[in-house]
């Protein structure tokens, strides 16, 4: 795990060869939907594992079949709320749940409009109550302009103030990170890698394309 010196509370996993290998497969335009979804699940699981290294632990006593000994309990792992941004984050959440099996789950359906306005449409929100000792993890593979996540974080803040507010993604653009940190300076951001920039259409470069379309197929246009 590597802290990005450009911002406070922003971390990447560029020093993990395994995570970088999965990311490389996701970037490949020839990776099919099945492999793409599996890759997102694996990233959710392994980045979730890395997140536990930042959580509070407690030393406890445990009794083996032979004698008593000391061990640890990752306390925060049992107080997690995962917010999934449909639809691209579904596989990412599946991986996170394998690490945070006690997590309560919230679902937000949000979509970003086209350039230049990038207006955000939200039509479904189900978020559990957030408690003061909770760690909220908002899962969204692509942190591009940051508009979607800022809107989601505003909704999450209505349900309570957590101990920690974490955004977990696969790729991020510097522009999106800066906007999020300006709006929510307390938010911690963990991504596999911070990419170079956004293009004029709001896509991350070099990126991996539209994560939702690549995981689940491009949606049909509404018939007229």
UniProtKB/Swiss-Prot annotation:
Q: How is its activity regulated?
A: Allosterically activated by GTP.
Keywords of this protein's UniProt record, alphabetized? Answer: Allosteric enzyme, Glycosyltransferase, GTP-binding, Magnesium, Nucleotide-binding, Transferase
Which parts of the chain are coiled coil? none
List residues binding uracil. Answer: 204, 209-211
Q: Where does 5-phospho-alpha-D-ribose 1-diphosphate bind?
A: 87, 112, 140-148, 210
Alphabetically, which GO biological process terms does the record hold? UMP salvage; uracil salvage
Q: Give the matching CDD domains.
A: PRTases_typeI
Q: What does it catalyze?
A: UMP + diphosphate = 5-phospho-alpha-D-ribose 1-diphosphate + uracil
Q: Which cofactor does it need?
A: Mg(2+)
SUPFAM superfamilies cross-referenced by the UniProt entry: PRTase-like (SSF53271)
Output the superkingdom of the source species.
Answer: Archaea
One Pfam family this sequence matches: UPRTase
Q: What is its EC number?
A: 2.4.2.9
- Keyword Acyltransferase assigned: no
Q: What role is this protein assigned? A: Catalyzes the conversion of uracil and 5-phospho-alpha-D-ribose 1-diphosphate (PRPP) to UMP and diphosphate.
Q: Which family does it belong to?
A: Belongs to the UPRTase family.
Q: What is this protein called?
A: Uracil phosphoribosyltransferase
Q: Give the organism the record lists.
A: Thermococcus gammatolerans (strain DSM 15229 / JCM 11827 / EJ3)
* Gene name in the database record: upp
